[in-house]
Amino acid sequence: MRKTKIVCTIGPASESEEMIEKLINAGMNVARLNFSHGSHEEHKGRIDTIRKVAKRLDKIVAILLDTKGPEIRTHNMKDGIIELERGNEVIVSMNEVEGTPEKFSVTYENLINDVQVGSYILLDDGLIELQVKDIDHAKKEVKCDILNSGELKNKKGVNLPGVRVSLPGITEKDAEDIRFGIKENVDFIAASFVRRPSDVLEIREILEEQKANISVFPKIENQEGIDNIAEILEVSDGLMVARGDMGVEIPPEKVPMVQKDLIRQCNKLGKPVITATQMLDSMQRNPRATRAEASDVANAIYDGTDAVMLSGETAAGLYPEEAVKTMRNIAVSAEAAQDYKKLLSDRTKLVETSLVNAIGISVAHTALNLNVKAIVAATESGSTARTISKYRPHSDIIAVTPSEETARQCSIVWGVQPVVKKGRKSTDALLNNAVATAVETGRVSNGDLIIITAGVPTGETGTTNMMKIHLVGDEIANGQGIGRGSVVGTTLVAETVKDLEGKDLSDKVIVTNSIDETFVPYVEKALGLITEENGITSPSAIVGLEKGIPTVVGVEKAVKNISNNMLVTIDAAQGKIFEGYANVL
């Protein structure tokens, strides 16, 4: 199972039912909607299509709303484009004007108060660089030297590297978009241009007003956000490393190390992190990724990212399906090359000790040492699954939850396959439900060793405190269990006591109709006892209880239906007999 999740931006190239189905089948886990473009009506159409196709395919696909954010842009230019030439001067005005090579204006009126002489102003993703030469507060104009030539079109982005700006956390448009997202029950909000914790709290305030359970992932795109990352993460559910604007706001050569540090801090807290922007950028035009792009994706996975994101590749590119397949193949290959033993050791040192983390560490170590097929996390809120994912186990993580909302929010978490399963909330019912669901996914089958982890008492968020080891097998018989032990052994069917004489019973489970005092010396040497006679006061029950031997009585036609030399598990607590090694310890 691929562990790294894939986020795809849905746009004109991918909004049809046919293409969304192809993206889901290729590996899309989360659909991103970029609210810098498009109307609410357009986005609603995309949301409806995504959910319709996901339901038809019986797949869980989450939806991420990416806000436009409090960005700075230029106003319109004369004839839609102007030419700025190196060595010339240009005035940046705070009052809206039609742009010319001598003067243009920006949407952010306080820019004049934030910059100083010597500050740099970058236009159009850094393609044009200006340096502030003079500031005229009376005219609300900033005179700049043009450091390199280029064409400037309408409404291009403006970046102020190294400058602390006083932009609001979210704009009115963002607030309207978030309320729309709440109405449409989106799963994640990616908040653009977050600089400080208060920016995230402004979004949380809107969510709390509407009682909406939506995860907030700030996008770190500037130096101020990088500087405040610890405080930002404290109030966030996850993070997006948005390398596009970040590579303009800070020197490009620093981006790789910043990426590693941001991912590491998320890993330490167990919060999901998405690495985004230009990951397979050439696939907007070409059917194959470059070698550098393949290395970029793989290295983000080695850094510890939970998810990798496609932007223009799927929104407007010529090869959206191929881009997702390429991303999937790179992820699978990178994951296969991981040293999971070293990864677990590194994560154990990285993450702070707590009760919940102790369970996560125990599960991950046990899964590694026993080479378990899957870890089944029974979870209400997704917390259990995230706790396990934090330690990057090699085993698949199957998150069994009664909540569709929780399942979708687990879609972004590394290594987690969410499954919606309703069920009773007693501990026994929860365990049985978890095992049955794991088998239904096709990830585990009879004879596979799995770990079940959950919180007890059930139904309470954030109480992960239980781990059980379980070997999957078919139930072949049941009756009344004596004691609470469990045992695995090979059956020896005895119609009379003579069938036991001279036999090594040290690894045997005796199967018989009933017993008397002549059986007792042999039963004492056996691992377990299965009989047809009924009742807790029957000789079989009394002997089993006195000798402390896992026993099941009242098993109909046990002698006839249970074969000799069959490996079975007796679960006395439940009065069940399983074929194979299916012990719950």
Curated annotation (Swiss-Prot):
One of the record's GO molecular function terms: pyruvate kinase activity
Names of the cofactor(s): Mg(2+); K(+)
One of the Pfam families matching this protein, by short name: PK
GO BP terms in the entry: glycolytic process
UniProt keyword RNA-binding, yes or no: no
Binding-site positions, K(+): N34, S36, D66, T67
Site (Transition state stabilizer): K219
UniProt cross-references to Gene3D superfamilies, sorted A to Z: Phosphoenolpyruvate-binding domains (3.20.20.60), Phosphohistidine domain (3.50.30.10), PK beta-barrel domain-like (2.40.33.10), Pyruvate kinase, C-terminal domain (3.40.1380.20)
Pathways per UniProt: Carbohydrate degradation; glycolysis; pyruvate from D-glyceraldehyde 3-phosphate: step 5/5
Keyword Zinc included in the entry's annotation: no
EC number annotated for this UniProt entry: 2.7.1.40
Catalysed reaction, written as an equation: pyruvate + ATP = phosphoenolpyruvate + ADP + H(+)
Residues noted as binding Mg(2+) in the record, renumbered to the chain: E221, D245
Residues involved in ATP binding: N34, F35, S36, H37, R73, K156
Amino-acid positions noted as binding substrate in the UniProt annotation, renumbered to this chain: R32, G244, D245, T277
Keywords linked to the UniProt accession: ATP-binding, Glycolysis, Kinase, Magnesium, Metal-binding, Nucleotide-binding, Potassium, Pyruvate, Transferase
Gene Ontology, cellular component aspect: cytoplasm; cytosol
Recorded family membership: Belongs to the pyruvate kinase family. In the C-terminal section; belongs to the PEP-utilizing enzyme family.
Protein name: Pyruvate kinase
Record lineage: Bacteria, Bacillati, Bacillota, Bacilli, Bacillales
Recorded name of the encoding gene: pyk
